[in-house]
């Protein structure tokens, strides 16, 4: 909950799905957003990405021209896919700031005076499916050179939609994952407060991980994440369960015993049976505390850290 006019130092957008971006316009009216982190999409692919899904109607500029969408008042950082990150440092591509996947963004970098706090975003090739779509559309006889034309995409939307449905995989599989926390040389304690019904608990460890809608059941993604975080993962005490608790995106080894597992759902996800009962059982069996955050403001979980 933010006060009117309050500054948000850094905003992470895990991926461009309506249920993950619909609150941004309201947030922009209510707060001042200083910095936004998004997955990198090549410029030539952004129009096809934005206009090949009608669920993104009204959010096209957020994808095609993010700087302009935020009225050029926020710094935009694009996280490169893993494949392009190995030999890259922070760089500017056509006046756009990019950063390698797995690179630490320190609190000092964003102007927040918290010692040793950092954010580590991961991008496992978020835009890969757009490339697959381009190849498949060309095979279907569509003009590849016009796939960056809004009118051409709209005129051929039904054909594009059918091809898109037949592609393997899911764009959720590669949404951003973000670690937020402190390095190993700090041992803080944490206090949780919940209203109404109020429960309080004290724990050591402030560190969090946000999985967005990513598929943690994919071995390559999971193994790369664990290799990067190594011993840091054991310090994580707050875990956002991927894809609203879907059993297709979950593996029980992402849960640390004694942690808080947060499942974010709204009324739409009840139709999809999220969270899945098997996910709930796995969370409880690991000794984690399950908390469900919904579109009801009273479900808010606030984390207060002291160190």
Segments predicted by a language model, with ranges:
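A cross-family glycoside hydrolase active-site/sugar-binding cleft signature
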Residues: 39, 211-212, 242, 264
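Active-site metal-binding motif and surrounding structural segment of the metallo-beta-lactamase
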Residues: 2-38, 230-246, 259
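Alpha-helix C-terminal capping segments
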Residues: 28, 202, 251-257
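Binuclear metal-ion centers of metallo-dependent hydrolases, dominated by the metallo-beta-lactamase
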Residues: 35, 43-113, 222-226, 253-307
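Active-site environment of divalent metal-dependent phosphoester hydrolases
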Residues: 16-21, 42-45, 215-219, 241-250, ...
